[in-house]
C-alpha cells in the first residue's frame, strides 16, 4: 500500500471520529451575584425543557470543560501542563476558579478585542478602513484589560473624534465614512440587536419600526465628517464635526475676513497649523481645509485662499441637517428631520451640536431603562459561548421577534444592568452555569437529528485567530505577539502570518453558526502550508520531535499527542487504528507526522466542543 493511500485511509478514519432597569422574577435579592444568577438561569431552562419532555445532558468532563473555556476566554487550546494541573486539582470549585484565572489573563482582552474588531470591520462600507482596524483593536483591548463598562465603551465609539491612527474609538465611524444612514443601521444592529435598517425605504416589514423612525435615528449623525488627510504619512483619516448651521458657526461662509483676523495670531497674513491648533473648533478641520484650499502648497492659508474655501457638503443640499429622501422625487431636498430615538420616542433638541447629538444618542442607547442595550449584549455573548442564542440571530432582535427562554434572558440582562454593565460579569455568570458546561451527548427526549437547543452543548467553529493561536500554542509559543497590524505607524498592519490567516479564515462573528463553513483555500492551507508542515515535522526541536524523543513507547507518545492537539486522550478505537498505521508504515517518525497532520486537520481541532 502506498504512503499516500495509507495516509488517506488514516485521515478518513480519524476525521470521522472528530467532529434598563427592568424587573425579572428570576432574580434573587442579590441580582449581581454571578453564581446566583447562573443557578436561576439553569432552573428556568430546566423547567422549560421539562415542559417539552427533555432532560438536559450531563455536565462535561474536566478536560472538555478546560478546552472549551480556554478557547472561549483566551482564544487558544490549553497546554498539556495546564490539562494535567487542572485534572489533578481536587478542589470542587476549580472550574469557578479557572474561569476567574482566565478572565484575568492578558489573552482574554486580546481574544475579545479581536472578536469586536471583526464585528465592526467585517461589514465596513469603507474599504480604506481595513488597514487601520488594528488601531481599533488596540484601543478596545485596553478597555477590556481595564474592565471598562460596556456603556462607557459604546459611548466612546459613538462620540469619537480625531485622527483615526491616534484614537481607536473612531473605528466604527471610520468603517462607514461617517455616513448617517450606515451609522444609524450599525448603532441599532450592534448595540441594540435591532435591524432597523430594514425601514430605510419603507416601514419595517416584520416589526413595528417605521421609515420615519429610521431616518430620525440617522438625524443624530449628519454632521460627522470622516475625511482623508491628504498630506499625512502614513495615510490617515480625521473624524470631526462640522456644525455650520449653528449660530456663530457660519463665519467661514458669511464673514471669512473676521474669522481670518481672529485666527491669524501673528498678523502675517497666513494661517499656519500652529495657529489653527490654538482654536479647538478650527483645528479639527484645518488639515482638510489645507487639502482643498492651499493652492500654493506652502502648508498655510492666505486670506484669498481662505475666502475661496468650499462649503462643507452633504450630498446636493450643502447643509449639515438631515433630510429623509423623497422616494417619489429623489432629486428633491426631502423632508428635514430632527433626531428622535426610536426606542423611547423622545426627540433631542434641534440646536444641539454634532458632539452633543451623538452624546445624547449614546446616553439613550445605554440608558438602563432601554432594555435592548443589555439584552443585545447578553444575547450576543451567550450565543458566542453556547452556539445557540435566545434569539435566532444576534443582531435581529425586537418586540415582534421569536424568543426562547425569555425569562432566562431577562434575568441575565437585569443582572448585567445592575452590575454597571460589567462585561466580565456576563462571562462569569454564563460560564458558571450548567447550561454552558453540558456535554455534546444528545439528551433524553431528543432524537439524534433534533437541535439540542440548550439541553446539550453545541459545537462551534473557531474564529480565525483562535485557530492560529491554538496552532502557535502547539509550537510552544504560548504568549506570542498576535496583534494584527498593517503598514507603518501605530496600529499599522504588517504583511504577517496573522494578517494572512485572518484574511483567509475570518468571518463575521454575527453570522449564525449553521452558516459558517470552511472552503477549499482554507483546507489547502491547513494541508499544505509551510506553517503546518513545520508544525508536524519530526525533525529539529518542534513539538512532535520533542514528544518522540521523550516517549519510546508508541502508545504513550500517541496519548500525549492527542492531549497536545485535541486536549483529550484517544479512544481505544483511535489508539488501535494509529498503532496499526505506525506498524504498517515501518517508519516511526513518518507515521507520527501523518498522525499529527490528521489531528490538526480534523474538524475537532477547529471546533469548540
Where are the predicted features?
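Long, His/Glu/Asp-enriched segments that create or flank divalent metal/ion-associated functional microenvironments
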Residues: 475, 482-491, 495-527
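N-terminal secretory signal peptides that target proteins for export/translocation
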Residues: 1-7
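Primarily EF-hand calcium-binding motifs
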Residues: 256-266, 286-297
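Boundary at the C-terminal end of the N-terminal hydrophobic targeting segment
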Residues: 23-29
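Primarily short, surface-exposed interaction patches in extracytoplasmic proteins
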Residues: 35-61, 67, 77-107, 121-251, ...
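Bacterial N-terminal signal peptides
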Residues: 8-21
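Conserved AdoMet
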Residues: 111-114
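Proline-centered structural pivot motif
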Residues: 279-292, 308, 312-313
